[in-house]
Amino acid sequence: MKKKYVLLAAFAAAMLTPSVVWAQYPQITDEAKENYKKMMTEERKRSDEAWAKALPIVQKEAREGRPYIPWAGRPYDLPQADIPSFPGAEGGGMYSFGGRGGKVIVVTSLEDSGPGTLREACETGGARIIVFNVAGVIRLKSPISVRAPYVTIAGQTAPGDGICVTGQSFLIDTHDVVIRHMRFRRGAQDVAFRDDAVGGNAVGNIMVDHCSASWGLDENMSIYRHVYNRGADGHGLKLPTVNITIQNSIFSEALDTYNHAFGATIGGYNSMFCRNLFASNISRNSSVGMDLSLIHISEP
């Protein structure tokens, strides 16, 4: 019996050595790490510049009745519409304003950035409804971050086979966002950057309907909490996302580059997760993160 315990202890110790623990993680070169660091530094600078242009518009609309509330952490912190975002909307996010009543922006280019692109439309300030007159694949060189609130992305308006966003992450970093009929395929384009296909710091009033997210390097989707930076000290307050609906969507084929091929982490307050399909992920189909007030409905 003593010999058995010794063997088990030796096996456990071997399994906990760094070479074994990290065996399934990619060996990232110093050059790749530096390239990633440079890319993200440039992207944060560019995103901050876009936000600096959008913020005055957001503040102006806030004075006119569309409040900007990045500190929301309870369902009643965010006002909601009197009617659903669209016929068939359900759950906590069904009364998201999205871009209702705002300007219509037409995506005319499949390029990563520039005039007529999805990135430009997402980074614009003010309530907006984003529609498409092109179809195809949008190959991102850096993540798209939606920071200005009150936006509807109507993927169903695209002709042909619709829109697929690939190459980098799509990040929801605000409130009152409606996304419908979109495909997100993160992909392992840069192993130094491990992130979700769809994620970010979603504040609340979020509706995702008839979308699919695949090939995430962390998870295919994470919507359950956000970090509110109250000042310039860099210390953020972690808060639950509120008023969320993820419905009629598919989360599949997460990539195992980091031994982390996970489906989704969901949570937050006043959330509904219904009629969604998980396929070919190793775990988290789905998992619950942080605080929770959730209705989770799975139907064939």
Regions found by a protein language model. Give the residues of each.
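Extracellular beta-strand-rich solenoid/capping regions of secreted or surface-exposed proteins
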Residues: 118-126, 138-154, 163-180, 186-204
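Residue-level detector of conserved catalytic or cofactor/ligand-binding positions
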Residues: 293-300
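Bacterial N-terminal signal peptides
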Residues: 9-17
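Carboxylate/His-rich catalytic cores and anion/metal-binding grooves
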Residues: 241, 246-247
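Feature marks extracellular polysaccharide-active and adherence modules
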Residues: 133, 154-159, 180, 185, ...
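Surface-exposed loop/turn segments connecting beta-strands in extracellular beta-rich domains
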Residues: 156, 161, 166, 182-188, ...
